[in-house]
Amino acid sequence: MNQVSEGSRTVSVEEMPRVLQLRAANTNITEGESTSQSRNVRWEEDVVDNENMNKKKTKICCIFHPAQEEEDPEQLCPSDHEHSSSSSSSSSSESDDDDKYNSEQRRQRRIERRRRRQKTNRPASPNAYEIQPDYSEYRKRMNANV
């Protein structure tokens, strides 16, 4: 009897790792324009110069107000000042008066104050994010100090 033995064999194949190369879409580059110039970012006219720092952004993320040199740091710190119990401002005196009323009366007074405030015809002021601050005076002072 002939015995045929079947064996197994392992074949190892080394594959080179594949490299994916991305290319930009073909844009119409004129012959006079170099490739480095064609890849520069181009800002539209409505893009905001963020706080005169020549950092272009499409949206304003925060409102920056430069500190005034005339400001006294002691005036800016309210913790050093004592507050008297008899306030002359109308908002705090109204809230002091509210302590005399029950919750329904306070609610009615709040509604009435809101209606009075809404009746006053004042022009709609733009949101701080809707306008670009004017730093021309700030620039003049900074240039004068140089």
Curated annotation (Swiss-Prot):
Subcellular location: Nucleus
An example Gene Ontology molecular-function term: protein phosphatase activator activity
Stretches assigned to coiled coil: none
Chain residue ranges for the region called Disordered: 23-146
Keyword Ribosomal protein appears in the UniProt entry: no
GO cellular component entries: nucleus; protein phosphatase type 1 complex
Keywords associated with the record: Nucleus
InterPro entries, per the entry: PPI_Ypi1 (IPR011107)
Gene Ontology biological-process annotations: glycogen metabolic process; intracellular monoatomic ion homeostasis; mitotic spindle assembly checkpoint signaling; regulation of protein localization to nucleus
Biased composition (Polar residues): 24-40
Cysteine disulfide links: none
Basic residues bias locations: 107-120
Domain of life: Eukaryota
Stated family: Belongs to the YPI1 family.
Listed PANTHER family: E3 UBIQUITIN-PROTEIN LIGASE PPP1R11, E3 UBIQUITIN-PROTEIN LIGASE PPP1R11-RELATED
Function: Regulator of type 1 phosphatases which maintains protein phosphatase activity under strict control.
Protein name, per record: Type 1 phosphatases regulator YPI1
Protein's organism: Candida glabrata (strain ATCC 2001 / BCRC 20586 / JCM 3761 / NBRC 0622 / NRRL Y-65 / CBS 138)
Gene name for this UniProt entry: YPI1
